């Protein structure tokens, strides 16, 4: 029997994971972006993280929350306020990437969101996130 070698997440995956955690903290605490970012970077192990991408994702997602939320609202089965905070953070980040980071292929955005949901979300949240993003991508002409 062979052992599977667990692959380290890519620097961009780590940036997405950290951005989701920072977004979660921002949503819960309502502290200023700068405070959340500084606290997060100070308190977390940022080794192997694409720091410029982390900062861009976190700051730009927060800056674009109204646009991101209005984009995803028609595809949710409940209001954004009723979503689990981790699911909301993952969806916000992914919708931001789908809408504004056009150099990132939509399949990569969706797959990364699913993987982050498997790591941080509830048992079946990755299925919910996949379903929502799979509907949003074509609406943004990303397919």
Curated annotation (Swiss-Prot):
Pfam families: NusB. The lineage of its organism: Bacteria, Pseudomonadati, Pseudomonadota, Gammaproteobacteria, Pasteurellales. GO terms for cellular component: cytosol. Belongs to the NusB family. NCBIfam families: nusB. Keywords: RNA-binding, Transcription, Transcription antitermination, Transcription regulation. It comes from the Bacteria. The gene is nusB. The keyword RNA-binding applies. This is Transcription antitermination protein NusB. One of its GO terms (molecular function) is RNA binding. SUPFAM superfamilies: NusB-like. GO terms for biological process: DNA-templated transcription termination; transcription antitermination. HAMAP family: NusB. Involved in transcription antitermination. Required for transcription of ribosomal RNA (rRNA) genes. Binds specifically to the boxA antiterminator sequence of the ribosomal RNA (rrn) operons. The keyword RNA-binding applies. PANTHER family: ANTITERMINATION NUSB DOMAIN-CONTAINING PROTEIN, N UTILIZATION SUBSTANCE PROTEIN B-RELATED.
């Amino acid at each position: 029997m062979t052992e599977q070698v667990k692959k380290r997440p890519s620097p961009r995956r780590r940036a997405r994971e950290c951005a989701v955690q920072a977004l979660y903290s921002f949503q819960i605490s309502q502290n200023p972006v700068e405070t959340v970012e500084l606290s997060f970077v100070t308190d977390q192990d940022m080794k192997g993280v694409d720091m410029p991408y982390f900062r861009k994702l976190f700051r730009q997602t927060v800056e674009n929350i109204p646009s991101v939320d209005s984009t995803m609202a028609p595809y949710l089965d409940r209001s954004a306020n009723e979503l689990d905070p981790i699911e909301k953070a993952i969806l916000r980040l992914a919708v931001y990437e789908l809408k504004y980071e056009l150099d990132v292929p939509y399949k990569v955005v969706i797959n990364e969101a699913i993987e982050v949901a498997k790591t941080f979300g509830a048992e079946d949240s990755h299925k919910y996130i996949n379903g929502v993003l799979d509907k949003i991508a074509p609406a943004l002409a990303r397919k």
